Amino acid sequence: MQVYTIKYALIKKKYGDIDIVIGGPPCQGFSNANRQKNTAISQNNMLVRQYIRAILELDPKAFVMENVSMLKSEVHRFYLTREDVQIVEDYNIPVKETSLCLLESNFAFDGVLNIIQSYDQIVKYLWDEKHYSELNVVYKASKNLQKLPDVLKKHKKNLLEFAKAHINDSDDVILKADSEAFTAIMAYFSNECNIATIKDSIAEAIMYQRMLSKTKEIFDNDIVVERYETESGINAIIKSYAVYDYLKSILESEKHGYIIS
């Protein structure tokens, strides 16, 4: 059962008043990313929301939450969504502007802002997850030329199969980068490309896919973007608030009356 689907009202109906709730998000998962996918939204931080939901809906006399000290780190923040706006106002949760880097300046191009502000455009250019995962493994391995041949050999079958979907003669910046990346992969397997050139050949496509993935997350999670800045790459300026402040502001509010120590 997913924690998001638990109906705590049914638990209260079955067991009556709850004395204490014990739990907490997993400490080993507390990093801001699934770095394979370079995600913007930490699912482990999101588990904190679910734990607080459990407390509010079960209304226990007391609760024990593990790893609270880790939540005080600036690393653990929620991005403000449209759904959050009223909650932040009601509980006076402190927010600040946060810059989310979508694309480094050396990969920026004319028209990129129009793409990242259009969900249809994002979906149009975004690869199948399996395609990204395969090429991203190669990109990471390309930093070590001694290991790269083994990685390419291991993933050869999938890479050659996926290449069929990406090789094209388009002048579109993103599609052209896609094509160049997989053309280089095919050239390597045909002994027409030096392995040392692989990294540069696929970097652009990988960076565009990471940008698209992050911007899709912004749409999917209904995150409020204050503005986009282009002085140093492409950055989404969004508001965020500390996970710990969220926890403390809600649970210690007059409405709920808990004391966090």
Task: Describe the function of each predicted region.
Residues 10-18, 28-261:
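Class I S-adenosyl-L-methionine
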Residues 25:
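Glycine-rich, N-terminal phosphate-binding loop of Rossmann-like dinucleotide-binding domains
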Residues 1-4:
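SAM cofactor-binding core of SAM-dependent methyltransferases
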